[in-house]
Amino acid sequence: MQAPPSFYEGDTLEVAKKLLGQKLVHIVDGIKRSGIIVEVEAYKGPDDKAAHSYGGRRTDRTEVMFGAPGHAYVYLIYGMYHCFNVITAPVGTPQGVLIRALEPVDGIEEIKLARYNKTDITKAQYKNLTNGPGKLCRALGITLEERGVSLQSDTLHIELVREEEHISSQYKITAGPRINIDYAEEAVHYPWRFYYEGHPFVSKK
């Protein structure tokens, strides 16, 4: 079952925690690639100095953040790595959640090929398939083409995991500072990174 539009509404920190344990799905050339979300970061611009929309900054890149919740915000870092975010909060309130890491589930062979251009990989390489925002986008084939796409689409969405299959019973949710935002002054210390403690696919312990 796809997460309905209402799933993405409300407080961004709560939406971030709700995303943990759900499945991010991208259909590429008719093949389903997916992973269970195990690490996220919340960004609450315009008051969050770590957010692209801090101060109400509105550009061609950030325009989608000002739109309806439940859409994809994809951007490039270092000119080469894509990052996938879920837009939250009401229209005009530019907030979102960065998906930082996944546990791969569907389309494993395609994911391996996307990451390493081969399917015969080591255990260490397997652990590195989707344990970072750029890695998971490459693995799932998410690019700037997906910026602004509704997460109600057939090809890109969040799939709700049934309670009896949800991994929240196996891992404790831990909160801590976000990663690689040294420029963000006091926002560096906000505990807005949420992850499953001890999960092997978390990007940073």
UniProtKB/Swiss-Prot annotation:
Keywords: DNA damage, DNA repair, Hydrolase. InterPro entries: Formyl_transferase-like_C_sf, MPG, MPG_sf. SUPFAM superfamilies: FMT C-terminal domain-like. Gene3D superfamilies: Methylpurine-DNA glycosylase (MPG). One of its GO terms (biological process) is base-excision repair. Its EC number is 3.2.2.-. One of its GO terms (molecular function) is DNA binding. The keyword DNA repair applies. It comes from the Bacteria. It holds the Pfam family Pur_DNA_glyco. PANTHER family: DNA-3-METHYLADENINE GLYCOSYLASE (PTHR10429:SF0). Belongs to the DNA glycosylase MPG family. This is Putative 3-methyladenine DNA glycosylase.
